[in-house]
Design a protein with these regions (language model features):
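Phosphate-binding/catalytic loop of phosphoryl-transfer enzymes
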Residues: 1-86, 90-91, 208-223, 231-232
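ATP-binding/phosphotransfer module of carbohydrate and carboxylate kinases, centering on a glycine-rich
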Residues: 12-16, 35, 87, 91-232
């Protein structure tokens, strides 16, 4: 894995400007690019190694340690399954789509059989959705905003599954936090790669957009002044 890898080590080999970004944060950056109206949300990416990200005020909010939204190692079941991080009961060990297939079955294969109505697959799916719902409830206890669900598993979720998931979240939510939107991510191909590139170009793009916005306001102000002069 890449545990312990530092930016300094990467920079020595690449010889170009570098930055490190969590894949979930990168995917969230792409969400902002795809939807300019997005302001506040908790993003939950159900990859084989799940993760999360926080969007606040229309921007990715990573915090001082660059790890806001890292829900994958939030304790979901105290003393539960062993996680690769060394702890037990982490969200990763219950919400990874790798927990869905039976022996020798692929993740797409699981969802294919699920669509056929196989009872045992339905039971496994229901249990998995319960765990995902509880993870979302836990995350929203800190940031009670809207929720975006993405990642490999989300690509296989139908609208009915998303609605079912929201119902499970509401059923577990404390009073006063059950009014929110829950939708599927855009699930674009290579979304995290797109987001990582956007993160690197963020200041440049903000400069262009900021200049354009200042120009628009200046033109509007000039037009208003001219109108006032004509009225006099």
């Amino acid at each position: 894995g890449n545990t312990g890898l530092t930016l300094e080590t990467i920079s020595q080999s690449v010889h170009y400007p570098c930055m490190m970004i969590h894949d979930s944060d990168a995917s969230a950056m792409a969400e902002l690019w795809f939807d300019s109206t997005l302001t506040d949300a908790v993003c939950v990416y159900l990859e084989r190694r799940p993760g999360g990200a926080v969007i606040a005020g229309g921007k990715l909010y990573q915090g001082p340690n660059q790890c806001n939204g890292a829900i994958e190692h939030m304790t979901l079941v105290p003393g539960g399954r062993e996680c690769y991080c060394g702890q037990r009961g982490c969200m990763d060990t219950y919400c990874s789509p790798e927990t869905l297939p039976e022996d020798y079955e692929s993740i797409p294969g699981f969802f294919s059989v699920l669509e056929q109505g196989e009872r045992h697959h339905r039971e496994r799916m229901d249990e998995w959705l319960d765990y995902v719902a509880q993870a979302i409830v836990n995350a929203r206890s800190i940031i009670a905003g809207d929720v975006i669900v993405g990642g490999e598993a989300a690509q296989h979720l139908e609208d009915s599954d998303i609605e079912d998931l929201k119902t499970r979240v509401i059923a577990r939510s404390p009073f006063g936090t059950d009014h929110f939107n829950l939708r599927k991510s855009y699930c674009a191909e290579d979304q995290n790669i797109i987001g990582a590139a956007l993160r690197f170009a963020e200041n440049y793009l903000d400069g262009i957009c900021g200049a354009a916005e200042r120009g628009r306001k200046s033109r509007a102000s000039t037009k208003s002044d001219n109108t006032s002069t004509m009225e006099v």
